[in-house]
């Protein structure tokens, strides 16, 4: 299932009900410098954001469910394990899964994500969406440059970029109902080529 994704079906082959359990699995393009024994051995890749926990939890659930697979089948129930790749990249591995048809016949999906705000042994539940979906936008500002000693002779795009970064979220917060759940976060910003 894609380059690293995996789908595992347990229980009934023609179920009356199919439940999917989803966990993200891929490493992130982050250099790990913790020095811990379990640190990534691959330079520039590590299991941050809980992905190692998510993959381990889903694998553990799969092992436990495999032990009762016959009982699930007798009850006409199936469980589909979705080891989802590329959660953090756009457009993301979920879209590949959906396009491949892995959601066909699935009645309910439970996803897992660790949350450091919860105490060990606690779980948090919510019906419906829990976190934001992401879209990626690229904004390019073009104009006449110049020297910092004469900003009045330039379009001063660095200043304009600062206004875009601060004003777009502010304007949207006044134009969109806050219950709609819209958030704008700029992940990377760059401006200019010279210090002056």
What are the residue ranges of the model-derived segments?
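DPxDG-like acidic metal-binding loop motif
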Residues: 55-62
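Active-site-proximal helix-loop elements at catalytic-domain edges
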Residues: 13-18, 115
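Conserved beta-strand elements of the Class I
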Residues: 19-20, 110
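Generic beta-sheet signal
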Residues: 18-19, 79
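Histidine/acidic-residue-rich, glycine-tolerant segments that coordinate divalent metal ions
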Residues: 5-7, 28-30, 35-46, 52-53, ...
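A non-catalytic alpha/beta surface segment that caps or lines the substrate-entry region
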Residues: 1-15
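Residues that form or flank phosphate/diphosphate-binding pockets in enzymes
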Residues: 16, 56, 92
